[in-house]
A protein has these predicted regions:
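Aromatic-lined carbohydrate-binding/catalytic grooves of carbohydrate-active enzymes
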Residues: 1-131, 142-144, 154
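Structured core elements
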Residues: 6-8, 74-76, 144-146, 192-195, ...
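Polysaccharide-binding and catalytic clefts of secreted carbohydrate-active enzymes
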Residues: 12, 17-22, 113-187, 191, ...
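Histidine/acidic-residue-rich catalytic or RNA/ligand-binding cores of hydrolases
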Residues: 18, 85-94, 155-161, 202-213, ...
Length: 421
């Protein structure tokens, strides 16, 4: 919590497993007690240490400290049966289990060593969740719920509002989930919903109406996330497409650096490591970034720099403007890029262009035709890196003839578009 001001944190997330100290199966990270969240007991040793370091003795007291610092608290919570350390259903931790309520749970297993998925076609189960989740999030001052692993069950051997093994299972489970989410929005102050669902599988129009953010994918890799953002943003609003990136995936000093790439370019002032760091962070701020590290090395100054850049410059036009796919889909070889534009905004920035050159094969110069500007106005283009290329052009010229952009070696560029004086 001491890093809050230094790295410009707005939100922090507790992910899978905070409720348990026991792994169900050697060689996996799946844990017991997935459904034992209602008692708000934190059992994971690392998070207990984190709470202790912050001077907190409970989930609520930790949330209170975060709230006092102006930080949103997101807690991951599953709608799965409660299993003990041996992998058997147990009724010792409250009501949400198949021992006490066998009809609340389907025969759907997302993966082995997990509890069966809740069947939200069951009206009694839905009513329990409406009350207990409101108590959990509202009572602990936690504003954001992050779901995962199919909160909306896709199959069930139970018969309730849907048929046993029927084709209407997902319909009624979606209806039940919506009843729960609507209740939380109406009864938990400032409630936010984050959808992960096995790494972004719930990218649909219903989820888009209730989720503040939707996970792009679970790779945690900058190039994969840039690709799924490109694809998903044709349908889902880019301000909702969360980019949860492991910053070591673009750190050339890390064993997690991937994909492997190199350049033959060695011009004055060019640093391959620095170029990859900037390209990775710029990939992450295409949508709402979620920065993480696996294996240490947080790069606090860079996290702070790009967090502020996203918050102050990208997010406003991301919300008010339009996103344009101005170059082909990222493939790790050729130039790719997108741009935001809002010619009618009262803000200074009328557009932002993100360009990426991931290989020497792509060539150093790319002609880029822009979109979404006012053809009758003149615009100043300010390059983040190659400031010698700053220029003034009309919207008509930019959207007809385009502009030539140079990136030597492997790298990226941001172009800020303002109205010319």
């Amino acid at each position: 919590m001491n890093d809050v001001d230094l790295i410009s944190i707005e939100s922090t997330k507790w992910d899978y497993g905070w409720w348990s100290a026991d792994k169900l199966k050697e060689g996996t990270d799946w844990r017991s007690l997935e459904g034992a969240w209602a008692d708000s007991t934190v059992r994971h040793p690392s998070l207990l240490n984190l709470m202790s370091a912050a001077g907190a003795t409970s989930l609520k007291s930790y949330a209170t400290k975060l709230k006092a610092r102006g930080i949103n608290f997101t807690v991951y919570l599953l709608l799965h049966d409660t299993l003990d350390a041996s992998g058997n259903p147990t009724g010792e931790y409250g009501e949400f289990n198949s021992v006490k309520h066998p009809d609340w749970f389907s025969n759907r297993l997302v993966t082995t060593a997990m509890g069966h998925s809740a069947d939200l076609g069951n009206a009694a189960c839905v009513e329990y969740l409406k009350t207990s989740l409101t108590d959990f999030f509202g009572g602990n001052l936690i504003p954001t719920w992050r779901t995962d692993f199919e909160p909306i069950c896709r199959s069930s051997d139970k018969e309730n509002r849907h048929y046993k093994n029927g084709s209407d299972v997902m319909y009624w489970c979606t209806k039940g989930f919506d009843e729960v989410i609507t209740h939380l929005i109406e009864n938990v102050p400032g409630f936010r919903y984050e959808s992960c669902s096995s790494g972004g599988s719930m990218k649909d129009l219903y989820t888009g109406t209730v989720a503040t953010v939707i996970n792009c994918d679970d790779s945690a890799n900058w190039l994969s996330l840039r690709t799924t953002f490109y694809d998903s943003s044709y349908v889902i609003h880019p301000a909702q497409l969360q980019i949860p990136v492991n910053i070591n995936s673009f750190n050339t000093d890390s064993p997690m650096f991937w994909p492997e790439m190199s350049t033959s370019y060695s011009g004055d002032g060019y640093d391959f490591h620095d170029a990859l760091i900037d390209m990775g962070f710029r990939s992450a701020i295409l949508g709402p970034p979620m920065f993480a590290t696996f294996g240490g090395g947080l790069m606090r100054e860079k996290v702070a720099e790009y967090s502020m850049l996203y918050r102050e410059k990208v997010r406003p036009i991301q919300k008010s403007g339009e996103l344009y796919h101005i170059l082909p889909r990222p493939d790790g070889v050729n130039w790719d890029g997108v741009m935001y534009a809002d010619p009618d905004t009262s803000a200074d920035i009328k557009g932002i262009v993100f360009l990426f050159k991931p290989s020497d094969k792509a060539g150093n110069v790319k002609n880029v035709v822009l979109r979404g500007l006012d053809p009758q106005k003149s615009y100043k283009l300010s390059f983040e890196d190659n400031t010698d290329a700053d220029c003034v052009k009309t919207g008509e010229s930019l959207m007809t003839d385009g502009i030539n952009v140079t990136v030597a070696g492997i790298g990226s560029e941001i172009i800020w578009i303002t109205e010319a004086e």
